[in-house]
């Protein structure tokens, strides 16, 4: 439970940020996704092509 706790918080913040900053949606989503993925499972690293 503790492991997914951080992931959930990150996902929530990501949704709120997406609604607020819809213009920088791709750039923000990339960084937030990387952070959430690192928190949940540090072994998996998603590739961010559009930075």
From Swiss-Prot:
Principal location class: nucleus
Comp. bias (Basic residues): 14-30
Domain of life (superkingdom): Eukaryota
Tissue-wise expression: Testis.
Pfam families membership: Protamine_P1
Region annotation Disordered: where it falls in the sequence: 1-30
MF-aspect GO terms: DNA binding
Disulphide bonds in the chain: 40-48
Family statement drawn from the similarity comment of this UniProt entry: Belongs to the protamine P1 family.
Protein name: Sperm protamine P1
Organism classification: Eukaryota, Metazoa, Chordata, Craniata, Vertebrata
Gene, per the UniProt record: PRM1
């Amino acid at each position: 439970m503790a492991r997914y706790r951080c992931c959930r918080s990150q996902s929530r913040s990501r949704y709120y940020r997406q609604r607020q900053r819809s213009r920088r949606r791709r750039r923000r989503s990339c960084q937030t996704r990387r952070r959430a993925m690192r928190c949940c499972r540090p072994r998996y690293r998603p590739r961010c092509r559009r930075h």
